[in-house]
Amino acid sequence: PVAEVAQVPEERGIRQTISIDENGVIYLGARPMAPDRLTAAIRNALENDPRTKVYLRADARATHRHVQEVMRATAAAGLNNLIFATNQE
């Protein structure tokens, strides 16, 4: 996604980045990950540090269905604040 204004968070802390490529493949960091494994990985990260922030980047060609899969997986892990990452135009 692209935004007119992009803000870099001041508090970096522990962060996980989930990416969805144009084929709908989900990655946690650089590792491909099925939605059920994503839930377990995010749950584990939150148990280790509840302040963990999770960012979602999706290719412009990724479908809404794949974004919903990630949203469901992170919600099932107990995450209540998924941050959508954008690139400034």
Each language-model region and where it sits:
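Amphipathic alpha-helical segments that mediate coupling or scaffolding at interfaces
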Residues: 1-3, 41, 45, 70
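Short, surface-exposed acidic/glycine-rich loop or hinge patches that mediate macromolecular interfaces
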Residues: 32-33, 61
